UniProtKB/Swiss-Prot annotation:
Major subcellular location class: membrane
Subcellular location: Cell membrane
The keyword Membrane is annotated on this UniProt entry: yes
Lipid-conjugated positions (S-diacylglycerol cysteine): C23
Keywords: Cell membrane, Lipoprotein, Membrane, Palmitate, Signal
Lipidation (N-palmitoyl cysteine): C23
Membrane topology: Lipid-anchor
InterPro entries (UniProt xref): Csa, Csa_sf
Protein name: Uncharacterized lipoprotein SA0401
Length: 260
């Protein structure tokens, strides 16, 4: 399998985890062009960051439509993962998905470690390990004990990007490469980050990234731009993505109904 197909497959696997509705309430008008709607959606998604106390989401209402059952407050889904592939190595990711049920006021999820590599026949082999976690007093707690002390500390000290990501400097006028496919429907837009961006420094420090490249911010979504009960909105901070190497931060912050 070629590099581009392999990487696309891997990203699609991650996206399947967060195929839920976009966050926040819509304020787009009928007069807005699709390009303007995408810009607004991009800005609104980034405006959610940071959420230092994740338990605040229990009292925050996300997107709602006619699919929600009466009385269902919904569930927030947060996902963050660093995807890396240093030159000559396999594709790996380490990250967490956390679901905050606003009805039960409980939060459960998993810390997930994945690796994709090609065998001698160029078939992709996937290795995955999941470690159940829960949120207690805004702290990540392992549901089952992990004997590896280094891994245990890594999991319990992990912070989702939504907790420390900060886009108060974001300029909507600098959004470029906006695309929209009405048949899917899906859409995307890019934002060139600056070298002194605090988010870049945070990611390099937290994940020991050794790249000097300035990343771009890629906003991707599917479904109605204004929000829907099916679809997703995702942010990728791409340091590099080529045949030689890949360093990408994936993050999603979305809300959806508990039952249909």
């Amino acid at each position: 399998m070629g590099y581009s197909k392999r990487f696309a497959l891997y990203i699609s696997i991650l996206i399947l985890i967060v195929m839920v509705a976009g966050c926040g309430k819509s304020d787009e008008t009928k007069e807005d062009s699709k390009e303007e709607q995408i810009k607004k959606s991009f800005a609104k998604t980034l405006d959610m960051y940071p959420i230092k106390n994740l338990e605040d989401l229990y009292d925050k209402e996300g997107y709602r439509d006619g699919e929600f059952k009466k009385g269902d407050k919904g569930t927030w889904v947060l996902y963050s993962a660093i995807v890396s592939q240093p030159k000559g190595e396999s594709l790996k990711s380490r990250g967490m998905i956390l679901k905050l049920d606003r009805n039960k006021r409980t939060a459960k999820g998993s810390y997930i470690i994945r690796e994709l590599k090609e065998d001698k026949n160029h078939d992709v082999q996937k290795n995955e390990k999941k470690y159940p976690v829960k949120l207690v007093n805004n702290r990540i707690v392992l549901v089952k004990d992990v004997k590896d002390k280094k891994l245990k500390n890594e999991i319990e000290s992990f912070e989702l990007f939504s907790q420390y990501g900060n886009f108060n400097h974001f300029d909507r006028n600098e959004i470029t490469n906006i695309s929209y496919n009405p048949n899917a429907p899906n859409y995307s837009a890019e934002y060139k980050m600056k070298k002194n961006d605090r988010n870049i420094q945070q990611l390099k420090k937290r994940f020991n990234l050794k790249t000097s490249k300035t990343p771009k911010l890629l906003f991707k979504g599917s479904g109605d731009i204004k929000g829907s009960s099916v679809g997703y909105k995702e942010i990728e901070i791409i340091f590099s993505r080529s045949k030689e190497e890949a360093f990408i931060m994936l993050t999603a912050l979305s809300s959806f109904q508990v039952t249909k």
